[in-house]
Amino acid sequence: MHPRFQTAFAQLADNLQSALAPILAGHHFPAMLTAEQVSTLKNTAGLDEDALAFALLPLAAACARTDLSHFNVGAIARGVSGNWYFGANMEFLGATMQQTVHAEQSAISHAWLRGEKGLAAVTVNYTPCGHCRQFMNELNSGLDLRIHLPGRAPHTLRDYLPDAFGPKDLEIKTLLMDEQDHGFTLTGDTLTQAAITAANKSHMPYSHSPSGVALECKDGRIFTGSYAENAAFNPTLPPLQGALNLLSLNGYDYADIQRAILAEKGDAALIQWDATAATLKALGCHNIDRVLLG
């Protein structure tokens, strides 16, 4: 078990501990539960779906990287597939505050990058900020997405974001988590192809500036992130943050990164290179390359 989980794990009920122990074994638990695992945990612990999600929230929050605020937020995105995806907030010392990943963004991008097609609910241990409410409004689940908070009745995103502005106001039909493939040809080595594949998945209906990042760890593991734009622009999630989020959730550290590649168009309206390189260098990675999409 990764050390970050030990305190939260020790506070769980005994029957839930017994069921979770084999799942959490090893240093690189993927911070997700399959539908089958969720069903097993519910039956073993005698909890319904909502109660189980609340019980597991401390494990999600334990994944937070909060060197600046020391305020850990955890979230669990519940996919329509039945799979659950952990998320937690991330802050990057030496970068800028704008590079921060919020817990809801973390869980949602985690689900998206693992191929989830839609979300039924998000469980989070603190009220979503306005930034995250706007980010969630880009999803194909729309304002019907259920939000669950401790000590409160569940509400929909519509309740938390009245009179919402979103992609439909801009006549955008393809939403975040809808299937997208922009068709750029895969070239280069494995890591380069992974970055291009991530760029092909980008949600970028506002700038038409696709981008993807691939990070290679010293043990050969590769994590990718795809660009996810938002109708309100500022809640947009850059591709590097998506990749760093997956890397961290899987129990890796920034020091494990040995190489990074950004794939983007050289003549795009928005360019990720400078911000991507600056953030990676702040985290200690200097082996950074760029491949241009054509």
Curated annotation (Swiss-Prot):
Residues 48-168, 186-294 form the CMP/dCMP-type deaminase domain. Binds 1 zinc ion. Keywords: Hydrolase, Metal-binding, Zinc. It catalyses: cytidine + H2O + H(+) = uridine + NH4(+); 2'-deoxycytidine + H2O + H(+) = 2'-deoxyuridine + NH4(+). This enzyme scavenges exogenous and endogenous cytidine and 2'-deoxycytidine for UMP synthesis. It comes from Salmonella choleraesuis (strain SC-B67). Zn(2+) binds at H102, C129, C132. This is Cytidine deaminase. The active site is at E104 (proton donor). Homodimer. One of its GO terms (biological process) is cytidine deamination. The lineage of its organism: Bacteria, Pseudomonadati, Pseudomonadota, Gammaproteobacteria, Enterobacterales. HAMAP family: Cyt_deam. Substrate binds at N89, M90, E91. The keyword S-adenosyl-L-methionine does not apply. PANTHER family: CYTIDINE DEAMINASE. GO terms for cellular component: cytosol. NCBIfam families: cyt_deam_dimer, PRK09027.1. Its EC number is 3.5.4.5. GO terms for molecular function: cytidine deaminase activity; identical protein binding; zinc ion binding.
